[in-house]
């Protein structure tokens, strides 16, 4: 019935000729304010036809709800109470911390070799060709890896693609940084392609990102980041990088976001579990968790530079 309408914002939506369909709850409230009777219809109207037309109009409104929501002003967010948690039975949410670690370690992509020919000197063109070919082949494996990240395949195909589109360069970069931890001052793009910053200089503008990647690898080394922590961080990048750029605020989209947040909580709990197992005190665990998550903002910054 009409009383079931719920304003997804603050019950103060603007209802005028152009925006009367944007929020049924506020539209109904405005009707009451100007004298419409609750629980009935005005006696001076022929009820049957009015109700029939109203029902048809509401069905049409509901069909267009997705498009309508996208036209709303950005600060009108649907209420969390509207989310039904229809993905709460996702297998990912019932995994233990150890099971998540095992799944992520098993999901790790295979090693990819570059087509580097040591007999040919680097030029800007040859370096870019090498790196883009390498990235292309890594991206194929990245898709298979993402499908094995707990909770990822529970999302719609559209949202899986969206998250990968947002995060692919950050994921490539964290993999590069992780591989390079044992090579101070160098970046290990592939087992047969280890570059120092002087070689990086041959691509215009590349040395700035090169230095940032080296600094991040140095931070990983200084913190003694473990492989289990690395796979958790990489999964967090996949799930988190695109979560705030979903195009719509429809209920379906909100349920997807809610699911992602729940999986992210599981992965963060897994990181804390790993730290507790390593013997860190509660305070040390929280500090290390914060330090690891702070590093992720640098990957976002580097990927924005790299685009």
From Swiss-Prot:
Gene3D superfamilies: Erythroid Transcription Factor GATA-1, subunit A (3.30.50.10), Retinoid X Receptor (1.10.565.10)
GO molecular function, one term: steroid binding
Keyword Nucleus: yes
Free-text note on domains in this protein's UniProt record: Composed of three domains: a modulating N-terminal domain, a DNA-binding domain and a C-terminal ligand-binding domain.
Keywords: DNA-binding, Lipid-binding, Metal-binding, Nucleus, Receptor, Steroid-binding, Transcription, Transcription regulation, Zinc, Zinc-finger
Subunit comment: Binds DNA as a homodimer. Can form a heterodimer with ER-beta.
Main location: nucleus
Residue ranges the UniProt entry marks as DNA-binding: 1-43
SUPFAM superfamilies per the UniProt record, alphabetical: Nuclear receptor ligand-binding domain
Places the protein is found: Nucleus
Gene: ESR1
Assigned protein family: Belongs to the nuclear hormone receptor family. NR3 subfamily.
Domain NR LBD: 96-307
Alphabetized InterPro entries for the sequence: NHR-like_dom_sf (IPR035500), Nucl_hrmn_rcpt_lig-bd (IPR000536), Nuclear_hormone_rcpt_NR3 (IPR050200), Nuclear_hrmn_rcpt (IPR001723), Znf_hrmn_rcpt (IPR001628), Znf_NHR/GATA (IPR013088)
Function: The steroid hormones and their receptors are involved in the regulation of eukaryotic gene expression and affect cellular proliferation and differentiation in target tissues.
Protein name (record): Estrogen receptor
ZnF endpoints (NR C4-type): 7-31
Keyword Zinc-finger belongs to the record: yes
Region (Hinge): 44-95
Organism lineage: Eukaryota, Metazoa, Chordata, Craniata, Vertebrata
Gene Ontology CC entries for this record: nucleus
